[in-house]
Amino acid sequence: MKSIFFSLSLLLLLEKKAAGIELYAGGTKGHFLVKTSPLMFIGKNQFLYGHKEEQEEAPEESIFVQTKHHEYGQDADADMGGALSSQELTSLKEDIVCEEEDELAQQKSQLPSQSQIKSQTQVKSYAAQLKSQPGQLKTIGQVKSQTMLKSHGAPLKSFKARLNLREDIPQQVKGRGYGLAEDLAQVRQQPAKVHRLKGKHRQSRKTAAFYPQFRRRSRPYPRYFVQFQEQLQGSVHHTKSFYPGPGMCYCPRGGVILYQDAFTD
């Protein structure tokens, strides 16, 4: 806008020297008996160029500058003034175009360059890759942990087997303890058994002395067995077979067991 006002002021000075100036405010006024040059209108938001007849419908607030040339009877002066006005208008147009080009250049400078756009797209792609990398790292860690677990699986199995053996050993010891307790109970019961065997031995001697006729009449088989047991330390049982003569009874030391079928009529 500053350049426009500057060009207008320059134009007015030049036209003042050439032909004179008339300034009109508001609407259009009167008719002139002089030859008129093109008009320039300055509105609120517009800049117009044309003849007076073409611009009669402009708003009343507009201000236009009319340049005219007085007829002094010399066409050369009029032609010179028209040439000057056309040159000034072209210079004014060039100034406007230069200002527009400057504004466009500023806007272009404000816009991001292609390299910046490419870098931004690369940054976005790198950001997406970085976001996807933690998931990939997790999967790689899982694979490594699985391989490590598989490699340590066999030692763990062997160690588990050893632990199972260690757990079984106390149970075996307990079982052996139960067996030893049973053996100890049997050993403790041995004196009672010995006492019973001694009582049976005394009864058998009494019966043998009480029934002499049974001894005389009895005929033993050619071969018969008398099983006897002797109580020794360690609960060891000895069995002995023999062939006694007629009327004889073998009674070993420590006890005797006579079977009824050994003595028959």
Swiss-Prot record:
Main location: secreted
Domain of life: Eukaryota
Sequence repeats: 116-119, 122-125, 129-132, 136-139, 142-145
Cellular component per GO, a single term: extracellular region
PTM comment, free text: Glycosylated.
Signal peptide (residue range): 1-20
Inducers of expression: Up-regulated in response to androgens.
Tissue: Highly expressed in the seminal vesicle where it is detected in luminal epithelium of the mucosa folds, and also in luminal fluid (at protein level). Not detected in other tissues tested.
Region feature 5 X 4 AA tandem repeats of Q-X-K-[ST], mapped onto this chain: 116-145
PANTHER family the record matches: SEMENOGELIN/SEMINAL VESICLE SECRETORY PROTEIN (PTHR10547), SEMINAL VESICLE SECRETORY PROTEIN 3A-RELATED (PTHR10547:SF7)
Protein name: Seminal vesicle secretory protein 3A
